Swiss-Prot record:
The active site is at 118 (n6-amp-lysine intermediate). It comes from the Bacteria. Zn(2+) binds at residues 413, 416, 431, 436. This is DNA ligase. It holds the Pfam family DNA_ligase_OB. Its EC number is 6.5.1.2. One of its GO terms (molecular function) is DNA ligase (NAD+) activity. SMART domains: BRCT, LIGANc. It comes from Syntrophus aciditrophicus (strain SB). It is an enzyme of class 6 (ligase). Signal peptide: none annotated. The keyword Transit peptide does not apply. It catalyses: NAD(+) + (deoxyribonucleotide)n-3'-hydroxyl + 5'-phospho-(deoxyribonucleotide)m = (deoxyribonucleotide)n+m + AMP + beta-nicotinamide D-nucleotide. DNA ligase that catalyzes the formation of phosphodiester linkages between 5'-phosphoryl and 3'-hydroxyl groups in double-stranded DNA using NAD as a coenzyme and as the energy source for the reaction. It is essential for DNA replication and repair of damaged DNA.
Amino acid sequence: MMDAESARKNIEDLKARIEYHNRRYYQLDDPEISDAEYDSLLQELIALEKQFPQWLTEDSPSRRIGAAPLSKFAPAVHLSPMLSLANAFSEEEILEFDRRLKRFLDSSERLSFVVEPKIDGVAVNLIYSSGVLTTGATRGDGAKGEDVTQNIRTLHTIPLKIQNGSDERLPEQIEIRGEIYMETAAFRKLNERRLAAGEPPFANPRNAAAGSLRQLDASITARRPLKMFCYAVGIVRGRAFTYHHDVLHALKKWGFSVNPFIRQVEGIEKCIEFYRELQDLRNELPYEIDGMVIKVDDLSLQTRLGAVSRSPRWAVACKFAATQATTVIRDIIVNVGRTGTLTPVALMTPVKVGGVTVSRATLHNQDEIDKKDIRIGDTVLVQRAGDVIPEVVKVIVSNRSGREIPFKIPDTCPECGSEVVRLAGEAAHRCIGLSCPAQLRRHIQHFVSRGGMDIEGLGDKLVSQLVNQKLIHDPADLYYLSHDALLNLERMAEKSVSNLLSAIELSKHPSLDKIIFALGIRHVGEHISKILARRFRTLDALINTTENELLAIRDIGPEVSSSILEFFRNASNRRVIEKLKKAGVSPLETISPRSAPLTGKTFVFTGALSRMTRDEAKQIVESLGGQAAGTVTKKTDYVVAGEAAGSKLQKAQKAGIAILSEEEFLRLAGKI
């Protein structure tokens, strides 16, 4: 039997190894071990800590799993105030900020600044004592916030213990400030899952981050895709810094995530250049930003400048123009989804929002309509952020004429006339018709989509014809369509029929993640499909999986696991899969990540590609173990430049990143 001292050494070794692999996975996007190996290390640690509880410490990775739910959040006092920033709304106001600094300092010398994107998230304050995380709190009123330490511990991008790879002494105590946020893609997927479960969606990524962080049950926070960028420190005891950029360098060295777009610049003119650059880059970033922050770099000057009211003189938040506009709701229609969910959609007078013309906006569900009191004929404020679907923020009640018409989701399905029900505990109304053509149409559209089987030429109108003519009753029927049956459909000539049948034949050997996505399993989007494909490698292995196997995979919780198991237990679904197999549909076995030729490499595509679409290029990269990103960063290995390549190419050239032509990329990927 292991003695206590041996257990202590094993526990310390396991903690160090797990935190190392956490950083490789969550911060560097470069894992060295499989999920199964990681889970084995974690379970070994948990077992040892249970056997030897005297060695269970606050910085243990086992603490990330989540403690017992709280009844309420306790207050947490910050060691130093978390001040709010004054705002600048134009380039002239940015110049005035610089003039104010020089007047106060009685100096005309050019100042050095640090500029950074202003993340639209939730500000938090972390306190580390002797290198160990002891408290995590929301900003609150600036003097005290809510103690959310249990939830903070579940975020893998936040070290439980400061990493120190040198002999340099760590601060005795330090406050680390940062912004907790949710990436736009993760936000969309979270809302998709919530809508599918009949839960109200979050209005925007910031609200989703705030709601996820302020969960009394930390296990819920642990399942939400939260991340954090650190941008400053408060009280520091036992360590001195000279410049703000030194602080950021130390934070990175200690294992914290710092935004890669932060820059040190000389003079206010360079700040304005960065402000313009960020506005151009804004919609390409994987997270939402609502401006830029400028800070005086010299910490001694920050001290001299001090604060006025509740804002520091040495920093300013430079806001972007709002991505909102007003318009009028002309009508409200109801769409029926593939799971039978009825979604109300506002048809609006077209209006430009964030540079894009918007004429439709989702209203989510009846609760959302009632809460905002949205009526046909209302003047409303609509919002569009990044590529998120436009939404109605609020009604301009003062514009009402009295002729506006309240809206209620119908009691019968607008597609098939079946009864519409709302199950207890759900926000969604659902059609319960077993043969609802709208549900089948949506299911087939999902199956043949680019993210699924990617069958070219099978558009929405043709799918509707196939369903209405009762030529298909499930996705597998597509592979049994005859030449003559297709030729009898509207606008289908000999050539178009031949092309469609060829496209259907070509789709028979997709990558495994594509067929998993195409099946339409509830809560399983493209991201989870890729995770499942990497883990199980064949469809049969996934079909025969167990709950324990699924729950051992990071990013898959009880809800997703239950949905997967229920799908494959369903006799009707199993029959469809058997029909697909008999038709010759056979997904390619997923390559082990370790043997894939592009493993660990990150690609960015820019310009127009002539031999493939961007999505096809991305699929090639991911199928060979690499990653496709939207922006050029220090982590980028290759930029693939097509015709009329833009700023991404210039940035890559300046950074010395390898540039590939489309042909060179295809050769590297083994496609030519």
